[in-house]
């Protein structure tokens, strides 16, 4: 879960979030910077939504989100001079490690980001960076406005239940859940499996037809002989 705070919270409201984060259903949490960026790109050249997550605890960030190279499975480390971006975002922007690209922040200002790594991630567009990189890119002092939350029970039902619980808090602006993405992946995989089953069945039937035709051909030739 990503739990985003309202910008104008008071101490009592923040304490309410802190108490919930210490609840029995939560395994651990870490404060992060969460922003929604945008970029006009893609095949249709339309506005794409990009999620930014920045942290001042890069060492433990992989406990909440796995960043790794798709081919080598090597961990992607958050460094000061560039960001790690999701694989789909890299493909959409046609960028590689060492390249730079621009995005628009929530106020419409254009920001330039250098690609330090590309992480295996098949759904959504994401940018990950450490606090030093954030300050360099946005020219602002790093501050947190959200929490990444690990739940003890990772089931979809519990994730949705805990997300709804956080949404009831006055200081919470929104909750981002990964259940939708997980369901989408499951649906895609299920559809691909069905397609593969159909293709295998067609291949088997085609092989039977070919063998039948070859057998008839051999029989006909022997009769003529």
Where do the PLM segments sit?
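Membrane-proximal juxtamembrane linkers immediately C-terminal to transmembrane helices
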Residues: 1-3, 45-47, 60, 139-144
């Amino acid at each position: 879960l990503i739990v985003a705070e309202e910008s104008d919270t008071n101490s009592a409201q923040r304490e309410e979030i802190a108490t919930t984060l210490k609840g029995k259903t939560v395994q651990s949490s870490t404060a992060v910077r969460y922003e929604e960026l945008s970029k006009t790109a893609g095949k249709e050249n339309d506005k794409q939504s990009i999620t930014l997550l920045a942290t001042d605890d890069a060492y433990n960030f992989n406990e909440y989100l796995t960043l790794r190279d798709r081919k080598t499975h090597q961990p992607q480390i958050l460094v000061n001079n560039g960001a790690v971006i999701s694989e789909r975002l890299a493909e959409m922007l046609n960028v590689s490690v060492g390249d730079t690209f621009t995005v628009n922040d929530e106020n419409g200002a254009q920001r330039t980001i250098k690609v330090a790594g590309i992480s295996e991630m098949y759904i959504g567009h994401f940018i990950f960076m450490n606090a030093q990189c954030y300050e360099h890119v946005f020219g602002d002092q790093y501050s947190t406005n959200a929490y990444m939350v690990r739940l003890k029970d990772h089931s979809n039902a519990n994730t949705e239940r805990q997300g709804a619980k956080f949404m009831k808090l006055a200081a919470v602006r929104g909750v981002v859940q990964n259940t939708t993405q997980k369901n989408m992946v499951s649906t895609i995989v299920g559809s691909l499996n069905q397609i593969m089953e159909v293709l295998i069945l067609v291949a088997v039937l085609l092989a039977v037809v070919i063998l039948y035709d070859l057998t008839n051909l051999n029989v006909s030739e022997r009769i003529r002989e």
